């Protein structure tokens, strides 16, 4: 359905930015709790959801730390937890792994895919990394200069590329 007339704060979607966009003056707990507080959650219900979100991304022991005390991978997981506790229908991710080293990127690909499947969230994942796209996606849209070249499963794109660019 068309949501263009729905205010952004009323749309049931989450966004994980390339730079994570964590609040540096807030603890990890407070960062994850932020969206829940905006929605009116407080007390034990809020604490429970925050702890569940941090456990989901393997950071249950980091809630009193600050973003500058975490590695890039840990910060990325906090940004993911902050969105996931809201249980959005759609999750938009803009190159969330681009600032990570190769080993951590591989690990986080697996983690993001696992969480996305466990929670059954539709995810629109923007990447320039072919391996990321092929390993994390059910369907891929390949774009070239703002135009769609092909849409299909990873296998369809790999076995039957529609254009030389897709190949």
Where are the regions a protein language model picked out?
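ABC ATPase nucleotide-binding domains
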Residues: 8-14, 18, 22-165
């Amino acid at each position: 359905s068309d949501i263009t007339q729905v205010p952004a704060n009323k749309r049931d979607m989450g966004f994980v930015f390339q730079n994570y966009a964590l609040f540096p003056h807030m603890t990890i707990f407070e960062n994850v709790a932020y969206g829940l507080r905006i929605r009116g959650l407080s007390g034990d219900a809020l604490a429970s959801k925050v702890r569940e979100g941090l456990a989901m991304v393997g950071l249950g022991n980091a809630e009193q730390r600050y973003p500058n005390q975490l590695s890039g991978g840990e910060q990325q997981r906090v940004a993911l937890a902050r969105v996931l506790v809201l249980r959005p229908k759609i999750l938009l991710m803009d190159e969330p792994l681009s600032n990570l080293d190769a080993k951590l990127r591989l690990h986080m690909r697996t983690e993001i895919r696992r969480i996305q499947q466990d929670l059954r969230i539709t995810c629109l994942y923007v990447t320039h990394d072919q391996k990321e796209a092929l390993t994390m996606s059910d369907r891929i849209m390949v774009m070239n200069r703002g135009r769609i070249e092909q849409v299909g499963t990873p296998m369809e794109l790999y076995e039957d590329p529609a254009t030389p660019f897709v190949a």
